[in-house]
Amino acid sequence: MDNDSQYSGYSYKSGQSRSSRKHRDRRERHRSKSREGSRGDKSVTIQAPGEPLLDNESTRGEDRDDNWGETTTVVTGTSEHSISHDDITRITKDMEDSAKLDCSRHLGVVIAGALALLSFLTPIAFMLLPQILWREDLEQCGTACEGLFISVAFKLLILLLGSWALFFRRPKAFFPRVFVFRALLMVLVFLLVVSYWLFYGVRILESRDKNYQGIVQYAVSLVDALLFVHYLAVVLLELRQLQPQFTIKVVRSTDGASRFYNIGHLSIQRVAVWILENYYHDFPVYNPALLNLPKSILSKKMSGFKVYSLGEENNTNNSTGQSRAVIAAAARRRDNSHNEYYYEEAEHERRVRKRKARLVVAVEEAFTHIKRLQDEDPKNPREIMDPREAAQAIFASMARAMQKYLRTTKQQPYHTMESILQHLEFCITHDMTPKAFLERYLGPGPTIQYHKDRWLAKQWTLVSEEPVTNGLKDGVVFELKRQDFSLVVSTKKIPFFKLSEEFVDPKSHKFVMRLQSETSV
């Protein structure tokens, strides 16, 4: 009965012949195989242009021997430049979104530039308009008045340089909402300039004031006010956020990689941009190939048992005993995936150590084949190579070990042959050791060191229950989403610490020797 249940999953107690049961079992096995085969035919793998020419079975490096892939031939055709309907839709959407973002960004820059130009030219206009409109009626400008011209000139120069350094920097990101403090400062500058113009028009232009020194002092007061506004901008935009107030935890949703940061008072959208700046150099590169369990564990299916009693009623007790035996056997064979996972991990670590040792030895031997040419050495034109040629010459001896190691550690999508050659050329040019060359490949590095096509996301989505213009508060949680994973951010306020002082007299540190009969001094 146990043998029959291994094939069909069921145990029958009937008067059918053994040959009919075997025929039925053979037919059911054939059907199951045909269903699995037809189901497997629907799996299609599309390789994006520019990726390494490694098929989908290259990720199953554990099932291959060490010599697999040496004579493999890959045939590529026009599918290298193929594109799907989903790709076209995504590209169109990205273009529309980027067009909207560019328009909004340029509009903000235009408004800020126009306001800055207005505030910068207003003091100059205050001093020039009387000279143009009623020059003959103006009083003479004495020495003190002429000294104010120098003061205005240098203050305007300082204001121009400070505004350029603070406001006209290249933006690091496009925010979904208006930056509140920056908008408030722009409104403050606009109200200040308009107020000065109103007072100037009513008290100076209409009355044609003849005191030119007073007019110049009025322009100087506007420049001083603008300098104070610039100081306020430095405090609100730069200094306010320097004092740490919160501790934030950033967790990548797929693999659980996390980091902790201390941060000051910032809005949620600015915190999101600050997190993304730190994410690319603090978090290891996202590798989806490392997330799944081995296929040998995932593909294992437990057999189900059903026991039917088709005989007479007096065999009820016997049937019940048989069913209990079958259930007990199934319980003994209960899923032992944790054991298989343990041995799979141990075998994988052993294979990684072995191929790492081969790679280290291959790179060490390859670097011994070249040396920098000194000025006093005899020069043979046939033996002289530039760094690129030297990298290509020694790469062949380490290529096989490098390929197997990257395949075993599942890093092959992030290192193309061209990128490895460029890194090797860089190391040769700067006289770096083999260990310095291998540093990039022996472990997952920060995200930003890889090619942008592998990690750069054009757009992140900020998901928050709080308005993104609000400042951080204790317990605030928000997400930064992209297509394949998200960053979950939780906030905790730094606690308030209360310290007390206790004075200890240095003369109180006195000791005595506790001697016993067995003590040896």
From Swiss-Prot:
Biased composition (Basic and acidic residues): 57-67
Leader sequence segment: none
Membrane topology: Multi-pass membrane protein
Motif (PDZ-binding): 518-521
Residue ranges, compositional bias (Low complexity): 1-18
TM region(s), chain numbering: 109-129, 148-168, 179-199, 219-239
Reported tissue expression: During gastrulation, broadly expressed in the dorsal region in both mesodermal and neural tissues. From the neurula stages, expressed throughout the neural tube. In tailbud stages, expression declines in the anterior notochord but remains strong in the posterior notochord and in the neural tube. Also weakly expressed in the prenephritic region of late tailbud embryos.
Compartmental location: Cell membrane
Disordered, as annotated region: 1-73
Gene Ontology cellular component list: plasma membrane
Domain of life: Eukaryota
One Pfam family from the record: Strabismus
Extracellular-side segments: 130-147, 200-218
Composition bias type Basic residues, residue spans: 19-33
Record's keyword terms, sorted: Cell membrane, Developmental protein, Gastrulation, Membrane, Transmembrane, Transmembrane helix, Wnt signaling pathway
Cytoplasmic side: 1-108, 169-178, 240-521
GO annotation terms (biological process): convergent extension involved in gastrulation; establishment of planar polarity; negative regulation of canonical Wnt signaling pathway; nervous system development; Wnt signaling pathway, planar cell polarity pathway
Oligomeric and partner information: Interacts with dvl/dsh. Interacts with prickle3.
Known function: Has a role in non-canonical Wnt/planar cell polarity (PCP) signaling; can recruit dvl/dsh and prickle from the cytoplasm to the plasma membrane. Acts in a PCP complex to regulate the polarized assembly of fibronectrin on the surface of the mesoderm during gastrulation. Regulates convergent extension in both dorsal mesoderm and neural tissue without affecting cell fate. Regulates neural fold closure during neurulation. May be required for cell surface localization of fzd3 and fzd6 in the inner ear.
Family: Belongs to the Vang family.
The protein's name: Vang-like protein 2-B
Lineage: Eukaryota, Metazoa, Chordata, Craniata, Vertebrata
The encoding gene: vangl2-b
